[in-house]
From Swiss-Prot:
Catalyzes the sequential condensation of isopentenyl diphosphate (IPP) in the cis configuration with (2Z,6E)-farnesyl diphosphate (Z-FPP or EZ-FPP) generating the 50 carbon product trans,polycis-decaprenyl diphosphate. When (2E,6E)-farnesyl diphosphate (E-FPP or EE-FPP) is used in vitro, both primary products decaprenyl diphosphate and (2E,6E,10E)-geranylgeranyl diphosphate (EEE-GGPP) are synthesized. M.tuberculosis does not synthesize (2E,6E,10Z)-geranylgeranyl diphosphate (EEZ-GGPP) and heptaprenyl diphosphate. Keywords: Cell membrane, Magnesium, Membrane, Metal-binding, Transferase. The active site is at residues 76, 124. It comes from Mycobacterium tuberculosis (strain ATCC 25618 / H37Rv). Its EC number is 2.5.1.86, 2.5.1.87. Belongs to the UPP synthase family. This is Decaprenyl diphosphate synthase. Mg(2+) binds at residues 76, 263. Activated by dithiothreitol and inhibited by EDTA. Its main location: membrane.
Amino acid sequence: MARDARKRTSSNFPQLPPAPDDYPTFPDTSTWPVVFPELPAAPYGGPCRPPQHTSKAAAPRIPADRLPNHVAIVMDGNGRWATQRGLARTEGHKMGEAVVIDIACGAIELGIKWLSLYAFSTENWKRSPEEVRFLMGFNRDVVRRRRDTLKKLGVRIRWVGSRPRLWRSVINELAVAEEMTKSNDVITINYCVNYGGRTEITEATREIAREVAAGRLNPERITESTIARHLQRPDIPDVDLFLRTSGEQRSSNFMLWQAAYAEYIFQDKLWPDYDRRDLWAACEEYASRTRRFGSA
């Protein structure tokens, strides 16, 4: 691998340069679990370049000042994808696993620095006990199965969500992945499990109320910044681009505080059919928009 293989093309265009034609491509996603290709060792112990898309398409050139810094995705459509094929809903979730890794690769190629993925919401506990049990075990196993690969790519993995009801084994695997990747800085992936925007704001409000009751905080001095500091991950930047797959047009209680001024793009593909080229297309549309943040 050339010394400058991961070097960005320009400070104004943060995309990775096109990969060499013989560089590994993302694996066939028709079987599960997908076997990730062996990547050439990175020079000087740095992160590996992601495998290129099977089409060998390169990330579009988008200037840094037009590129979303933080993309949040509601990964919707796994169940419908399976139902359309006469399969159990769990099969759709399985096929969505490879898409998560492909999207991470595409985000790295494009130069996105923050990616938040809605893996399990606080409302998903309402699903059948069988599906909930599957999703708990599945999320635990996905993190365990993919953390080494993501570490090699320079991904920092973090869990965002609430502890009540969440399986201890899931929390443990997320903690291991977070510790393993804490020094990585290519991209941060917030893996949101047992997450709800209203729950997050409620928890922040409860903690602020405790501080007021203890005399540590003057209620007259509470500001938006006060609330932001008490969110589950205070350092998460505001969402720039909010994506939802499957054609549904709603936020489903995801990143309510952080996405206050996000650009929303709803894409029709079901999550198992989605790939990095769809992410790139959404980012190109984002780049064409004018963000006013309430101004004229």
